Every structure is written in structure tokens, then in C-alpha cells.
Amino acid sequence: MRTLFIGDLHLSADRLDITKAFNRFLDTELDDADALYILGDLFEVWVGDDLAAPFALELARRLKQISQRLPIYFIHGNRDFMLGKQFTDAAGMQMLPEVTCLDLYGVSTVILHGDSLCTLDKAYQRFRKLRSFAFARWLYSCLPKRKRQAIANKIRSNSQSSNQQKSYVIMDVEPSAVDALFAQTHCKQMIHGHTHRPAIHNFTNGCKRIVVGDWYEQGSVLVVSADGVDLKSLPFDAS
């Protein structure tokens, strides 16, 4: 048996090729799986469950069917932090806290989206703190739909522009934040996404940090079993 981890698909109506690739993944990669974990940024942007796009609603129906035979877990990312219970219920997904510990075939593991580890990005961490307040999210949800969409588009545009000017170091995780989370959770393994830099990092103390990749040019899935871990790339169908 095996457990699968994915993240940073950034699904949108503008990139239906990614949705197609994800559906193919759901068709071909879930055999003998114990569970599927989605580590945030399933969608490129999410302004509210009441504004879910048709392709997202169709995906929810697909995931709901799969959830009848396979548990699907979801952790919020920085792009879909407004995704709520209405959608997760429709998709059959179980929402997890942003930092969750679990036992993976005898290995204590902490899973998260990963944006909280990029502590050198001070501007983003300020925004992250603001949107962590339930009142701020509630206030945003009370705005008219058109206003919410406009704000989301503005934030997305500013983020893309800002990221182009940030250094490689600032955009990556801060080692001290990684060490602190290992110490806080007492786990031996960490799995996250967000940075779009898929890799397996082994530490001298026996700990392991695994980063799942994004789905912009190809798919990425981490397969964990009793035999170990396998970080796989999934080429998109050229057709």
C-alpha cells in the first residue's frame, strides 16, 4: 500500500490542460493507495465557495466519487485559503489543520503547505498573518462577488510582480524555520510544497524534508510506502 501527496496544481479555467492531467492522474495513479493528500494551492485563486468555476464544480463531483473508496485530505495553500467547507464537503475532502502530524508507515511525519517556512519574505508573512484572522476572512466573504474577484485579481497580480523581484533565497524556506518545526513536532520527516522546487533533503540527524513539485509544466507526486519515498514526475500528454 502507498500514500500519495500532491500540491501546487494551481488549477484554473486558463489552464485546462492541467485539469486534464490531474484527471488522468486520478484515473491511473490511485490503485492500491491508502490516501491522497493535497497540500494546498489546488487552485490558482479561490475567492469563495459561492464563486466556484464550472470546471471546479465538475472536479468536486469527480473527487466526491473517488472519496467513497479513498480518503482525500486537504490543507490550505496561499492561493486557496478561502476554500471552505461547502466545497470540501462537495468534493469529499477532509480539511486538515495547516500543520498536521501523522504516522506514515512507522515514520513520524509533519505535513504542511510550506509558505509558513519562507520567513525571510517579510512582506508575504505580514499578509499571511492578516489573512489568518477569521474576522478578516469573514469580512472579505461579505463583500460583493465582483469586489472579491477584483481584490483577488489585484493580489495575484501584485504577487506575480513582487516575486519576479525577490531573490532565490527569499523565495525558499528558511533553514531555521525548518529546524524549529522539526523541534516543535518531534517528527523525523517533513512533507510540503509551495516553493515549486521538488527535492528530497536528507539531514545528518536522520531527518528528511521532501518538497513536492508544481504542475505548471508536468505533474508531481510523492509516493510514500513502507519501502520508502519516491518523488515522481508525471509528463503531460502532448495531445
From Swiss-Prot:
Show the taxonomic lineage: Bacteria, Pseudomonadati, Pseudomonadota, Gammaproteobacteria, Alteromonadales
Q: Short name of one Pfam family for this protein?
A: Metallophos
Say which domain of life the source belongs to: Bacteria
Gene, per the UniProt record: lpxH
Q: Which protein is depicted? A: UDP-2,3-diacylglucosamine hydrolase
Q: Where in the cell is it found?
A: Cell inner membrane
GO molecular-function term, one example from the UniProt record: UDP-2,3-diacylglucosamine hydrolase activity
Q: What does this protein do?
A: Hydrolyzes the pyrophosphate bond of UDP-2,3-diacylglucosamine to yield 2,3-diacylglucosamine 1-phosphate (lipid X) and UMP by catalyzing the attack of water at the alpha-P atom. Involved in the biosynthesis of lipid A, a phosphorylated glycolipid that anchors the lipopolysaccharide to the outer membrane of the cell.
What family does the Swiss-Prot or TrEMBL record give for this protein? Belongs to the LpxH family.
